[in-house]
């Protein structure tokens, strides 16, 4: 914020490159939670930022919080392919490499990456049983859903 505040007076345009989108996973409201990512993006625009560039946003729809401003989200899967095509010294051990999708939401990205790399793909299946008692205790599992 200090850098933006110091440069906004003399800069014609301010672009912020944010490799990791701050609070990017907090994009859905449940209960009385705040939408921290949307609030942060709106605050940057109010400070005078013209465009925000990020990589692999958890949910690209977060750009809807700043519809009149620039928001570029670059997916790393395309960058992997460009890197592999450009740097011929990179060798992939296709017998020992496998792309894993941690859940259904990442499945399309995992399929794309596995196809580009020419390797197998796998997926985890998560099942939740909220009524289960473990060793006489009721565990609390904090999950990112």
Residue ranges and their predicted role:
Residues 1-145:
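PRPP-associated nucleotide enzymes
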């Amino acid at each position: 914020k200090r850098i933006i505040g110091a440069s906004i007076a003399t800069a014609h345009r301010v672009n912020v490159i944010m490799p990791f989108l701050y609070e990017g996973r907090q994009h859905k409201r449940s209960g009385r939670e705040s939408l921290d990512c949307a609030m942060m993006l709106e605050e940057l625009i109010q400070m005078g930022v013209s465009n925000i560039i990020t990589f692999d946003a958890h949910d690209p729809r977060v750009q809807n919080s700043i519809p009149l401003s620039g928001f570029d989200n670059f997916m790393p899967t395309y960058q992997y392919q460009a890197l592999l095509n450009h740097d011929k010294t990179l060798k992939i051990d296709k017998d020992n490499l496998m792309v894993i999708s941690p859940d259904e939401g990442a499945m399309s990205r995992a399929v794309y990456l596995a196809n580009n790399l020419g390797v197998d793909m796998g997926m985890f299946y998560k099942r939740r049983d909220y009524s289960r008692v473990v060793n006489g205790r009721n565990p609390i599992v904090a999950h990112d859903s």
